Amino acid sequence: MNHAPHLYFAWQQLVEKSQLMLRLATEEQWDELIASEMAYVNAVQEIAHLTEEVDPSTTMQEQLRPMLRLILDNESKVKQLLQIRMDELAKLVGQSSVQKSVLSAYGDQGGFVLAPQDNLF
């Protein structure tokens, strides 16, 4: 059985999944991006399995090379966008920790509210 057409089709599907993931990351649809990740991983595993069964010809390798480049470029862009998002989340977590520390430090004032007085003289 000739698996070469199936291998080529599997690569096309991987390109589509890669483009979807890049679009989701660009649009900051993080939940959807995470949900689509498993389908992407499965597609990569299918290609690995098919590649074991098929020894792609030089011609087929030349046809697949641009797809591989596109997939790698998309993956790099997704990683960059994810890093930006992780930095944003780290900043928010840091701000939350500071707020918690401030509330903890000033919340233990024995029930007294510290406020400036209007007439100091």
UniProtKB/Swiss-Prot annotation:
Keyword field contains Transcription regulation: yes
Task: Identify the Pfam families for this entry.
Answer: FliT (PF05400)
- Please identify the protein, giving its name as recorded: Flagellar protein FliT
Which gene specifies this protein's sequence?
A: fliT
- Keywords assigned: Bacterial flagellum biogenesis, Chaperone, Cytoplasm, Repressor, Transcription, Transcription regulation
Q: Which organism is it from?
A: Escherichia coli (strain K12)
Iron-sulfur among keywords: no
Which segments carry the region annotation FliD binding?
60-98
**Stored InterPro entries:** FliT (IPR008622)
Any one cellular component term from GO for this entry?
A: cytosol
**Family, as annotated:** Belongs to the FliT family.
What is the stated purpose of this protein?
A: Dual-function protein that regulates the transcription of class 2 flagellar operons and that also acts as an export chaperone for the filament-capping protein FliD. As a transcriptional regulator, acts as an anti-FlhDC factor; it directly binds FlhC, thus inhibiting the binding of the FlhC/FlhD complex to class 2 promoters, resulting in decreased expression of class 2 flagellar operons. As a chaperone, effects FliD transition to the membrane by preventing its premature polymerization, and by directing it to the export apparatus.
Which locations, inside or outside the cell, does it occupy? Cytoplasm, Cytosol
* Complex and partners: Homodimer. Interacts with FliD and FlhC.
Q: Where is this region: Required for homodimerization?
A: 1-50
Q: One biological-process term from Gene Ontology? A: protein folding
